[in-house]
Amino acid sequence: MSGMLLESESDHEDSEISSGYSENGRLMSQDPLSLSTGNVMQSRLEQYSKRLSQLGLAATDGDSNGDGTDNDIIPSEYDEEEISVPKQEVPMTTSLILDKLPPTTNEFLHQLSIKEMEQDIEKTVHKIQIKFQPIGSIPLITPSVCTISSQQTFSMIILFLKKRLKVEQVFCYINNSFAPNPQQTIGSLWSQFKVNDELIVSYCGTVAFG
C-alpha cells in the first residue's frame, strides 16, 4: 500500500516538474517577441527625440514619462515681432527730461543757459566809436568821438546831434558820401564803412549832398 502511495507521489512530482519545464519553455519561447517589442518602442522613442531636436524643442523628463505639459516645451527663439519695441525720437531739450533731473542740476543748467545768453549778447552787442565831423558853419561838438551800442539805429545819432547842437534839424552823412536810412543799425553801417575801427559821421545844418 505504501509502495503505491510513493509511486503516486513520485508521479505527481514528475508531472509538476514536467509542467514547470513546459511553462518555462513557453515563457522562453515568448521572450524573443517581448524583446522585439521593447526594441521597437525604444527605436520609436529615439526617433521621437530626434524629431524634437530637429524642431528646436527640448524634451523634458515629463515627455518621456508621457505626462508632460505644454509649459515644458520652450521655443529655441522668440518671435521678433512679439518682442519688438517701437522707436520714437525724443529731442534732448524736452522739459520732461529736465523735470526728472535733481534740483541742483536744474539750477546749474539754468545758470549756464543764462551765462551763455549773456556771452552771446556781448558778442553781438558791443560799443562802436563814432567820429563826428562838421560841414560848413555848424559848430563842432566836443568830444568829437563818442560811443554807441551797435544795436541802436542811426536815428539815435541824429537825435543826439540835435540835442547837443540845440537845433531842430540836422543832416548827417557817412564818410561825406551818402545819407543813411535812419532805421539802419549802427553795427551794420560800422561793419561796412568803418575807417580805423571808427564810423565817420559828417553833419551840417543844410543839405550838403544831392
Swiss-Prot record:
Q: Which Gene3D superfamilies match?
A: Phosphatidylinositol 3-kinase Catalytic Subunit, Chain A, domain 1 (3.10.20.90)
Here the cross-link named Glycyl lysine isopeptide (Gly-Lys) (interchain with K-150 in ATG5) sits at: 210
Q: Which key words tag this protein in UniProt? A: Autophagy, Isopeptide bond, Membrane, Protein transport, Transport, Ubl conjugation pathway
- One Pfam short name: APG12
Q: Which GO terms describe its cellular component?
A: Atg12-Atg5-Atg16 complex; autophagosome membrane; cytosol; phagophore assembly site membrane
Compartment(s) of residence: Preautophagosomal structure membrane
Query: Which SUPFAM superfamilies does the entry link to?
Result: Ubiquitin-like
InterPro entries assigned:
Atg12, Ubiquitin-like_domsf
Biological process annotations from GO: autophagosome assembly; autophagosome maturation; autophagy of mitochondrion; cytoplasm to vacuole targeting by the Cvt pathway; glycophagy; piecemeal microautophagy of the nucleus
- Report the membrane topology from the UniProt record: Peripheral membrane protein
- Biased region (Low complexity) positions are 60-72
Family stated for the protein in its record: Belongs to the ATG12 family.
Describe the function of this protein: Ubiquitin-like protein involved in cytoplasm to vacuole transport (Cvt), autophagy vesicles formation, mitophagy, and nucleophagy. Conjugation with ATG5 through a ubiquitin-like conjugating system involving also ATG7 as an E1-like activating enzyme and ATG10 as an E2-like conjugating enzyme, is essential for its function. The ATG12-ATG5 conjugate functions as an E3-like enzyme which is required for lipidation of ATG8 and ATG8 association to the vesicle membranes.
Q: What is this protein called?
A: Ubiquitin-like protein ATG12
Q: What is the lineage of its organism?
A: Eukaryota, Fungi, Dikarya, Ascomycota, Saccharomycotina
